Amino acid sequence: MHFVRQLTVPAPSDRVFAYLSDFTTTTEWDPATVRTSCISGSGGVGTRYRNVSSFLGREATVDYVVTELDPGRRFALRGENATLVAHDDMRVQDEGVGTTVTYTATFELKGFRKIATPVVAPALKRLVDGGADGLRRALQRL
């Protein structure tokens, strides 16, 4: 399942990127996130985060690793647990009078759970939409 959300905010791109590339800020903008902690690293490629989110009435833990970091422009992570693999890609574009963020989230259910994809897809869409709305509000406060 692949979701792309784009939003433009008045905040300067350097502040937007600094905020996004600290994945622990998900607790401030993603309504599904219960907590996110940095397990190892200092934010660069290879940094590991543990995210606990509430999804369909249950808490799920996903361990993420930063896979791409192009300072000021792109931040990408790969997350995994026993049931899914997730890829989050955040791209930042300076618009002169604001910043456009393109947020791409991809989820792949593992094993026999793949057959549940059509059932889970609407809930994941709501999850991504809620995250994008929360992200817009958080970035507008920068």
Give residue spans per PLM region.
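Hydrophobic ligand-binding cavity/cleft-lining segments
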Residues: M1-S37, G44
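Well-ordered beta-strand positions in beta-sheet-rich domains
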Residues: V4-Q6, T61-D63, H87-D89
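Hydrophobic beta-strand positions in extracellular immunoglobulin-like domains
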Residues: V9, S53, A105-F107
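Amphipathic alpha-helical segments that line or abut small-molecule/effector binding pockets
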Residues: D14-F17, D129, D133
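Short, flexible helix/strand-to-coil boundary loops that buttress conserved ligand/catalytic motifs
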Residues: L20, D30, G79, A116, ...
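Glycine-rich portal/gate segments that line the openings of hydrophobic small-molecule binding cavities
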Residues: S37-T83, E95, T100, G130-L142
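Beta-strand/loop substructures that line and gate deep hydrophobic ligand-binding cavities in soluble
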Residues: R78-G130
